[in-house]
A protein has these predicted regions:
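C-terminal substrate-binding/cap subdomain adjacent to the FAD-binding core in PCMH-type
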Residues: 1-147
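Conserved glycine-rich FAD pyrophosphate-binding loop
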Residues: 123-281
């Protein structure tokens, strides 16, 4: 459910239910003012924030992939290569630079299974604490060690060195592709991979940090990943919704914008689907 206030002389309230929320979802502030939303909840769990260490990245990635395929109850599972260890300064005792890591949030009832899986995969658990214990120890929670938080860990220390990419891998996921990419790009890209699901299927993402050289080199890498590897790149270096992730104009969003923001005042230039002549006179 979304409640939206329109941007016009006499604002109106529009309520969207069910699939109708797609008229405003992922619109980046272009489709009226959202003033209320309802969303589904599940019972809270006291997740175990864990780090598992492996001798090589392939082993870490295989562990996470298998755990997901076999439905280990985890809220987060992020595979982070050893070259990131230098940026996790509060975790030097748990993430040494000679090993690769998997950061996870594991359900309490799945911890024993998780520990056994790590051991069977040749890894070791270096950290396992509840959120309260993490806070007491002044350590970062697992969610600050994955997804784009990983990028931020590097940028905090080397802000002029790095940018990043957002990569969706083809399904079914082939770990050998990651090996080829890591070999191809060497020190240009530091990788971490995120376990996720889309449409009920396993989907692997990566948000590698990219050593900035030039715009031309950045887009050369993007082109290689798309054309050679079959990946989809959600470009974080562009302004519009379509050029970044959507890849095409969503007519549903544009039609709703005509209703909720008829003068085109909200976040102008964010979507290529809206043209100046569409604005109400």
């Amino acid at each position: 459910y979304l409640r939206i206030v329109t941007v016009e002389e006499e604002p109106r309230v529009i309520e969207l239910y069910g699939k109708d929320i797609l008229k405003a979802q992922h619109a980046y502030g272009t489709n009226g003012i959202i003033t209320a939303m309802d969303y589904a909840l599940t019972p809270a769990k006291d997740w175990s924030h864990t780090i598992a260490l492996f001798n090589n990245y392939a082993a870490a990635l295989d562990f996470a992939k298998q755990a997901q395929e076999e439905n280990l109850d985890a809220f987060l599972m992020t595979v982070v290569e050893r070259r990131f260890a230098q940026y996790y300064r509060k975790l030097t005792d748990y993430f040494p630079p000679e090993l690769d890591a998997v950061f996870s949030m594991i359900a309490p009832e799945a911890v024993a299974d998780y520990n056994a899986r790590v051991k069977d995969a040749g890894g070791t658990v270096s950290l396992a604490k509840t959120l309260h214990e993490i806070e007491e120890a002044n350590l970062p929670p697992a969610w600050e060690c994955g997804w784009n938080h990983t990028t931020l860990q590097a940028l905090k220390q080397e802000p002029k060195v790095w940018t990043y990419l957002q990569v969706a891998y083809p399904r079914p996921f082939d770990p050998k592709l990651v090996e080829r990419q890591m070999k191809r790009y060497g020190d240009e890209l530091f990788f971490h991979h995120e376990m996720a699901r889309m449409d009920g299927q396993i989907q692997i993402f990566a948000l590698p940090i990219l050593r900035w050289a030039s715009k031309e080199r950045t887009y050369e890498i993007i082109h290689e990943m798309e054309e050679l590897d079959g990946c989809m790149i959600f470009d974080p270096h562009v302004i519009t919704i379509e050029d970044g992730g959507m890849k095409e104009i969503d007519s549903t969003l544009i039609e709703f914008k005509k209703e909720a923001d008829p003068y085109g005042l909200m976040n102008p230039g964010k979507t290529r689907g809206w043209r100046p002549e569409m604005a109400k006179k």
